[in-house]
Amino acid sequence: EKPVVYDDIDGLDYEAISDSNPDVILAAYSGITQEEYDLLSQIAPVVAYPKNAWQTLWREQITMDATAMGKQAEGEKLVKDLDALIKEKTANYTDLKGKTAVFCYFNPADLGKFYIYLPTDPRAAYLTDLGLSFPESISKLGADSFSIEISAENIDVLKDADILVAYGNDDLLKALQSDALLGTVPAVKNGAV
């Protein structure tokens, strides 16, 4: 039986969740509040993030979710298999070794600010699985959240990044390259986005 996945952008639909009669509610990678946790717990056991919202790394997510579903051995095997696959695939990209990277979100309609996913965010943390590291300017940013908003005037935080990872396409790269501030970032100039 396939799990039911809910879009929670407009809040949790407790009635729909209850109607699906879940055995367990998986929210290891979520931002549920204590109040939401308490309400969901009235429906079924809830696996919530252990420390901070949106900061449960993928290995921990798999382990927690698999354990909650009574499939701990399968979860451990999946983590091991994925680690082996990552190692196998990254072996083909030795030129990434020693490079720094930053995972960002840019809105092409408003390049006056952007967001950096911090090393505690699973998307950003995955970059280290690929053999990349974070520039010192990013590593020393606060870790209370999974991301931080940066004004384009503070673009210097990206100057040491060899690679920028971002959601978007070639149009985003063109917009970044033609922006007066963002276009000065070496990774943007070099097309390493």
Predicted regions, residues:
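Structured C-terminal subdomain patch of bacterial secreted/periplasmic proteins
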Residues: 67, 158-193
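Short helix-initiation/N-cap motifs at beta->coil->alpha
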Residues: 6-14, 141-152
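Structural recognition of the beta-strand scaffold that forms the well-ordered cores
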Residues: 24-28, 47-48, 101-104, 163-166, ...
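Acidic/His-rich segments in extracytoplasmic proteins that coordinate ligands and/or metal ions
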Residues: 1-68
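Solvent-exposed loop/turn segments at secondary-structure junctions
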Residues: 30-33, 52-55, 106-111, 169-173
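Extracytoplasmic substrate-binding proteins
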Residues: 38-110
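Short helices/loops that flank or line small-molecule/ion binding pockets
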Residues: 14-21, 149-160
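Alpha-helical, coiled-coil/dimerization segments enriched in small aliphatic residues
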Residues: 113-146
